[in-house]
Amino acid sequence: MAYRIEIPVNGLQAPASRGSRKALTETMKRIITNYGKFIKTASEESNIPASIITAFIGVESGGNPLASASGTGTCHPTLGLMQWNRSYTRSTLEREYKANRLTDVERQILAKYGITFDKNGKTRNITCNDQKIAELNILIGSIILGQLISELTSKSKGWALDDNELLRLDKIISVYNAGMFGKTGKIATESKLGGVPVDTTTVKKYRDLVGSFNNTTKNYIDLMMGKDGYLDILTSDLKDMIYG
């Protein structure tokens, strides 16, 4: 299905507590320098813009491959560059495999780290050490985002695109941040998205939209795609930076 992802940078205000534009720019430069090759591959295989993958890495971990919800280096279920939870990642990969959505390159990279599938489409459990591997963490994080986008663009799920085939990035960010999607492969209910229903037929003003989310989700969205946020920087100041 063809769709466009809107990346608005106007109408949102930066949270007072977040770093300066200069500091965030340096973080993005470091992420692209250190992991640009992996981001480029993940982008090509998942069809998710490299800028979006990079921004997720920035928001989730600041580019620290050992970042953990319980402290750097600890073996928390949520760990690594894109902070996905290994407790549900096995089922995520098995769904992709059974649906024949894993590309040859994705399978090769997974196999490189010992993640293969048996005749029934089953694979091994994902470990803490797997999450610390930058290439693998970025690839799997992008696969999770790809599944989420597929769900959000399915007209049979009640999350259909609007008439302009516009995929709202706020939805992707909110569901990924909440960790609701990966557990089941299904988006639960709109009422659970930031605590309020989200209008799927009208693209609201983003200030009004983000104002309806809880503070954690609001700050996450602001940092990702607000004024002076990661996507603002990546699509302007760093738009010519080369990945890989």
Language-model-detected regions and their locations in the chain:
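Non-catalytic cell-wall polysaccharide-engagement segments
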Residues: 2-14, 26-31, 37-38, 44, ...
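Extracellular/periplasmic catalytic domains that process cell-envelope and extracellular macromolecules
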Residues: 45-49, 74-77, 165-167
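A short alpha-helix capping/helix-coil boundary motif
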Residues: 17-20, 32
